[in-house]
Protein backbone atom coordinates (compact mmCIF):
# COMPACT_ATOMS: atom_id res chain seq x y z
CA UNK A 1 0.00 0.00 0.00
CA UNK A 2 2.84 2.38 0.77
CA UNK A 3 4.39 1.87 -2.69
CA UNK A 4 1.02 2.55 -4.33
CA UNK A 5 0.51 5.69 -2.23
CA UNK A 6 3.96 7.06 -3.09
CA UNK A 7 3.62 6.37 -6.81
CA UNK A 8 0.09 7.77 -7.00
CA UNK A 9 1.02 10.90 -5.02
CA UNK A 10 3.96 11.50 -7.36
CA UNK A 11 1.61 11.33 -10.34
CA UNK A 12 -0.83 13.74 -8.67
CA UNK A 13 1.98 16.26 -8.15
CA UNK A 14 3.30 15.84 -11.69
CA UNK A 15 -0.13 16.32 -13.24
CA UNK A 16 -0.90 19.36 -11.09
CA UNK A 17 2.42 20.93 -12.13
CA UNK A 18 1.83 20.09 -15.79
CA UNK A 19 -1.63 21.66 -15.73
CA UNK A 20 -0.63 24.79 -13.77
CA UNK A 21 -2.61 23.90 -10.64
CA UNK A 22 0.26 22.92 -8.34
CA UNK A 23 0.84 26.41 -6.86
CA UNK A 24 -2.90 27.07 -6.56
CA UNK A 25 -3.64 24.34 -3.98
CA UNK A 26 -2.62 23.88 -0.36
CA UNK A 27 -2.30 20.08 -0.28
CA UNK A 28 -2.63 17.30 -2.82
CA UNK A 29 -2.01 13.62 -2.21
CA UNK A 30 -3.24 10.08 -2.71
CA UNK A 31 -4.87 7.82 -0.12
CA UNK A 32 -4.94 4.03 -0.36
CA UNK A 33 -7.57 2.26 1.70
CA UNK A 34 -8.08 -1.39 2.54
CA UNK A 35 -10.94 -2.01 0.12
CA UNK A 36 -10.47 -3.76 -3.21
CA UNK A 37 -12.45 -3.18 -6.39
CA UNK A 38 -12.87 -5.04 -9.65
CA UNK A 39 -11.54 -3.25 -12.70
CA UNK A 40 -10.44 -4.22 -16.18
CA UNK A 41 -6.81 -4.86 -17.08
CA UNK A 42 -6.42 -5.55 -20.76
CA UNK A 43 -9.34 -7.80 -21.63
CA UNK A 44 -9.72 -9.41 -18.21
CA UNK A 45 -11.23 -8.50 -14.87
CA UNK A 46 -8.72 -7.61 -12.20
CA UNK A 47 -9.06 -7.11 -8.44
CA UNK A 48 -7.03 -4.18 -7.17
CA UNK A 49 -6.74 -1.23 -4.84
CA UNK A 50 -8.82 1.93 -4.80
CA UNK A 51 -6.81 5.16 -4.76
CA UNK A 52 -8.56 8.30 -3.55
CA UNK A 53 -7.18 11.68 -4.56
CA UNK A 54 -7.48 14.59 -2.14
CA UNK A 55 -6.74 18.13 -3.32
CA UNK A 56 -7.61 20.95 -0.92
CA UNK A 57 -7.23 24.68 -0.45
CA UNK A 58 -6.90 26.39 2.93
CA UNK A 59 -6.02 29.81 4.29
CA UNK A 60 -4.97 29.12 7.88
CA UNK A 61 -4.94 25.31 7.94
CA UNK A 62 -7.89 25.32 10.34
CA UNK A 63 -10.38 24.24 7.69
CA UNK A 64 -10.01 23.08 4.12
CA UNK A 65 -12.22 22.93 1.05
CA UNK A 66 -11.83 20.59 -1.88
CA UNK A 67 -10.49 22.14 -5.07
CA UNK A 68 -12.78 22.04 -8.08
CA UNK A 69 -10.20 20.76 -10.55
CA UNK A 70 -11.15 20.72 -14.23
CA UNK A 71 -12.37 17.36 -15.45
CA UNK A 72 -9.43 17.11 -17.87
CA UNK A 73 -6.95 17.30 -14.98
CA UNK A 74 -8.84 14.67 -12.96
CA UNK A 75 -9.08 12.44 -16.01
CA UNK A 76 -5.33 12.72 -16.63
CA UNK A 77 -4.53 11.86 -13.02
CA UNK A 78 -6.90 8.89 -13.04
CA UNK A 79 -5.67 7.54 -16.36
CA UNK A 80 -2.02 7.74 -15.35
CA UNK A 81 -2.55 6.11 -11.96
CA UNK A 82 -4.56 3.20 -13.33
CA UNK A 83 -2.12 2.71 -16.21
CA UNK A 84 1.17 3.23 -14.36
CA UNK A 85 0.67 2.07 -10.77
CA UNK A 86 0.62 -1.71 -10.49
CA UNK A 87 -2.27 -3.02 -8.40
CA UNK A 88 -4.69 -0.10 -8.82
CA UNK A 89 -8.07 -0.61 -10.49
CA UNK A 90 -10.05 2.45 -9.38
CA UNK A 91 -9.31 6.13 -8.74
CA UNK A 92 -11.78 8.35 -6.90
CA UNK A 93 -11.76 12.06 -6.05
CA UNK A 94 -12.68 13.16 -2.54
CA UNK A 95 -15.19 15.96 -2.21
CA UNK A 96 -14.98 17.13 1.41
Residue ranges and their predicted role:
Residues 1-96:
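ATP/NTP-dependent adenylation/nucleotidyl-transfer catalytic domains that generate, transfer
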